[in-house]
Amino acid sequence: MTMKALLSTAALAVTLGGLSAATPAMAQTPIALGNLVDYSGPTNDVGTPYGQGVVDTYAWINKNGGVNGAKVNLDTVDYGYQVPRAIAQYKKWSGADKVAAILGWGTADTEALTGFLAEDKIPDVSASYAAALSDPTGAGGKAKPAPYNFFYGPSYSDAVRGMLTWAADDWKAKGKTGKPKFVHMGANHPYPNAPKAAGEAIAAELGFELLTPIVFALTPGDYSAQCLTLKSSGANYAYLGNTAGSNISVLNACKAAGVDVQFLGNVWGMDENAAKAAGAAADGVVFPLRTAVAWGGNAPGMKTVMEISKMSDPSGTTYRPVHYIAGVCSALYMKEAVEWAAKNGGATGENVKKGFYQKANWVPAGMEGVCNASTWTEKDHRGTLKVDLYRMKVAGATDAPLNDLIKNGGIKLEKVKTIDLPRKADWLGW
């Protein structure tokens, strides 16, 4: 072999060796995700456990090898439920150091960002379940296209439809006659208002008499006046559109006023912490659960949830409310979509979006019996139309630690019914 050939062979070997050595390093390039949370604003009561669920999940993912060997850099930012702060943060996440995807929070900010997400091709798995975020193409005609928006669980609108379907049957089962009366309650804000029209439409369809909506703020306060209005209206079923924090104030005020009504909470409207705070006033509230079980439930996937929880509670003794587990499920759906993207062209926003369409009746690995199966398609981002209804049961004083109250049955979640809604085209995006 000539000297020239030897040198060429050596050079090729060095090049191949260099590429071989570089490959693992390239595979380890961190994957950036944004995580918008409310730890300090008016929805922090439910935002804190949900956000902790997301943070713990990615800490656990990184501890167990990351995504295809790559670490996830989760940038968690508390925006205090302020839309301008959310938009300012989004500009950073869509800038030079662009994130592959975002785990979002509120309705007002998520809807404000929908067009930007589509333009910048950044998927957003939000904690807003506004139906307007579920129509990727705009074909439903009720909302603007939201091709990069996803959420885990039934939409606010579908949850109301499920609860009112149950309420109509409940009215008959109790032997009541005449039209039951329904009222929408909540702040005059995009989040509580999101399912208002859809709820009132199906209520009318089901034979309810619609009452004038009752407005109360997103923050705790004295809502005695609202409860007196509710009492005098003769309402039989009342939808609580706010988060648990302000709902507690309403429940307590209405109990004091002697209001006899069946409260229907939205998905953020009730949890174990709220039941402890409200005590007997929370007894009987019906609300939807996004997961198949609550904390400590009998399911194979609960072992995974318990391990994830230890990332911020090494002792494993903290009771996690329903919102924490929903945060875990949302984070793991995102993780698997990112994982698919990394294996199919790279973890870009476009590929992550495609990752959400790869499975039908999808439950994240290791979460069997915990996360309800979800299916997203390019034409329909309603991941599920199943609405699992539970009743909050409170017996006796609630001064003891939450763990003890749950163990002793002082607070418990009682399954009421599962409503499987039809996938109606005219409900898409509404």
Question: Where are the model-predicted features located?
Answer:
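Immediate post-signal peptide segment of exported/extracytoplasmic ligand-binding proteins
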Residues: 23-35, 63-71, 168-181
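The feature captures the short pre-catalytic strand/loop hairpin that immediately precedes
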Residues: 142, 300-320
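Short, polar/charged alpha-helical segment
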Residues: 43-67, 197-205
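Extracytoplasmic "Venus flytrap"
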Residues: 30-55, 77-84, 106-107, 185-194, ...
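Segments of small-molecule ligand-sensing domains
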Residues: 311-324, 335-404
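Gram-negative bacterial Sec-dependent N-terminal signal peptides
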Residues: 1-27
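Beta-alpha junction/loop-to-helix N-cap segments that form part of ligand/metal-binding clefts
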Residues: 30, 45-52, 64-139, 152, ...
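Extracytoplasmic ligand/sensor domains, especially the bilobed periplasmic-binding protein
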Residues: 99-211, 262-287, 293
